[in-house]
């Protein structure tokens, strides 16, 4: 099946005499004490996470925004006193020991400078702080001032515009700052250079003072909740310059919730819950939270239909909502992202926002216009340029961008879960105009549950390999054949990525066995067996007699038929308790289909004329092995599947789309080798019709993308399917598997990448990340 793509006779992972594994070799799961794992408290963690999904969103205080709110004067008292004195109290009580305010990190001194100067302004303006507190803050600014122009420091959005203006505000208030004048000149020159380039000046309007038309800003950008951009700082700045009842109501509503401080963005409920859903899915623990996730998505879709500000006024939120809703079959259309197809207007956008747009651009359906393709083109180029220019300072974000671009065609689910656990930072800091933490989304509970669940799977995967080895070496004697590829370890790896739930181990074992057998049979038909032996094996399976009653012409035919017979009988027995019927006849039929496909391919090698592309794809769909492997596998997913469902039109479309993706991607990688061996291949067929190699490959890739869109549409639809989502997902994962296997440029790259992924999945324990330098 998929092994056709591997084609790696020299690959150490495919050694014909691969040694059996010993229990626990290289398995260090027991060392996970570094992340405080206890396999007994998963239920408690699930309960706590469910409460987070349903409860109030947790977000850290923003010293920067609280300071701007503290600067708002009370107009009822002729602006001679603060309108929000409780914010001043918070500032006084929350200075850091080094004199700064805000979240601290060595890589975020610009953020600390911004927060500290912002806090000094209202303290000095209203004359409420002790001289020592002010001196400590001023001293921090003096000692850290050089960081303001350091390109290696992570910069908050709009820092180059806002920070110089706050220096000017300090000067207007007679607050002396011991800053080098050359540095101040550089800051203001940088500010002047940034002003014409920044396409989102209104968002950083607190750094523009009287130079901006505040009435126009309010008219164009004030949201229904009274805020400007859901930003307390910008809203407070508007209220300082223009008395606006809605702005005041917004700030009052904030302080009724947070009492003495404000966050840097509010409201953030929709975005926070979408992030939480995205993490639960990406970390592989979503199966514990199906009702909660569905509730979040239903509410999000309701707001989507209303074009709610909280979604549509936030680019990252809109992109994430589109992706998550579409992947669950909600009717959302790409025109909602049409405003973002012009990449030039996003020069000043954060890399994390562009990454969200990039991920949204990949969820394409057949009926879509070119919006998502255009979005994909510029976001891919933007992110690639960010990597090449080394401008992403946050190492966690850098790894996320690298991971997404490297796997832009597809990634296996379990590998994705494992790598997402590595990327999950419980102390993760996000940054807008200031840095903040998001405990609802990044917390120890989610990490521990993900790590514990992964360790449970990892231990189960180890047991399954030993079970597969007994089947392969003892029950089937497949290693007694002196030809062909032993892909047992790879099929074990592939099966682990088809279903992650440790309880569905029979499904993984079935998938691994079926792929191993199809690979052995394919090698026999392709390189070793004669036409007569190929006919004989098909007839033996059609007649289905006990191996001991048959006189075989060769040991190879005996081993192969006996392996098919024994394995099929065993799978049918194991499927019976769930299915309530014997599936043996279905499996026999599928074996005949795939072997007939092999036979047709053998005959085509000696044919005088090539088939046309449609005829070839029909043959290739059968011979790639998706039908027997996936249609056998889905009987072990814990849901009842009738024979009518398996033989029905929907299933036919599902497996044929998945098979076409795999076959055509295989062809792109192997056509040069197969051309030398005088075999048929879709690329060769198109080149024979007059296309160049480049044109032929491009045409095949377009077919693949179209098939992928068709497959995704069948998988995500919410109505009209006879299969539950877990079954339809098996075909989506099969398509992703094709992209994973054929995402490499040569036969030597593949084993190295796969070997690394196998090590992560089967041996390496997850490690906790807790570093305040991880900022997005």
UniProtKB/Swiss-Prot annotation:
Its cofactor is Mg(2+). It is found in: Plastid, Chloroplast. Pathway: Secondary metabolite biosynthesis; terpenoid biosynthesis. It comes from the Eukaryota. SUPFAM superfamilies: Terpenoid cyclases/Protein prenyltransferases, Terpenoid synthases. Mg(2+) 1 binds at residues 522, 526. One of its GO terms (biological process) is gibberellin biosynthetic process. Residues 1-36 form a transit peptide. Transmembrane segments: none annotated. Its EC number is 4.2.3.-. Its main location: plastid. A motif (DDXXD motif) lies at residues 522-526. No detectable products in the presence of CPS2 or CPS3. The Asp-Asp-Xaa-Xaa-Asp/Glu (DDXXD/E) motif is important for the catalytic activity, presumably through binding to Mg(2+). Belongs to the terpene synthase family. This is Ent-kaurene synthase-like 1. It comes from Isodon eriocalyx (Plectranthus eriocalyx). The lineage of its organism: Eukaryota, Viridiplantae, Streptophyta, Embryophyta, Tracheophyta. The gene is KSL1.
